[in-house]
Amino acid sequence: MNWLIDSFKRFDKKIAIIDNNKKYTYKDLLDKIEEYLDCLKDKVKRGEVVAILGDYSFENIALLLALYLNKNIIVPITSTKESEIKERLQEANCDKKLKVDNEKLIIENLNCKTKHQLIKNLQNKNNSGLILFSSGSTGKPKAMIHNFDNLVDYYKGKKEKNINMLVFLMFDHIGGLNTLLNILSIGATAIIPKNRNADEVCKIIQEYKIRVLPSSPTFLNLILMSKSHKKYDLSSLRMILSLYLQYQFHLCQMFVKI
């Protein structure tokens, strides 16, 4: 049995995810994962490269974990531009494209004939994988492949905590997925914002007493410029997590002073 699934069974009625103001327990999440695993039977083979279209949602998180258990190579794609989606599907050598529409799982065959050697290596080891794309700010976005089993197992044995954490970074961002895995491994609650504007995020921080904010210097600047921090009580915040704050330490100091 998988250690993460064992943890979900133990967490049981604790709130795992709040999506669109609706609360889902760890039992709800486990039930949805099992539902998707049943849907994948005979339709998605182990080791196939599978894209998930869409951003964070209760359903997409359950689908991500179902594909992880099915030992697939997973490609989260949050873009809504058809040309960009098509390019990423081709670049990642995707076999299937999955989308949840009105709670119904839609599976589309892409029949990719070629596979990169790094994908073959994961398939030969019977490991799940994760393919993410660079931002493309300095040119064409580059595909990066990760061993998803290793990413998940990094969080094994973490101490259980009762805290609310905001899932801010995108579904196709390594920082966002690390945040999600950390939350679920410790039995905490992941709160998905309706959108990522400064007002909405500050409102959530106040409402759910958020203590940890995964963010970026750009977004912290937006909060300061919009003065959303003056409309809401952000005193619950204890930590700001970012890959880039070491280069923006003065900004972090300014934010702490508000």
Question: What does each model-identified segment do?
Answer:
Residues 152-164, 172-212, 226:
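Conserved AMP-binding/adenylation subdomain of ANL enzymes
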Residues 25-26, 127-156:
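Conserved AMP-binding A3 loop
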Residues 102-128, 145:
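Flexible, low-complexity linker/hinge segments
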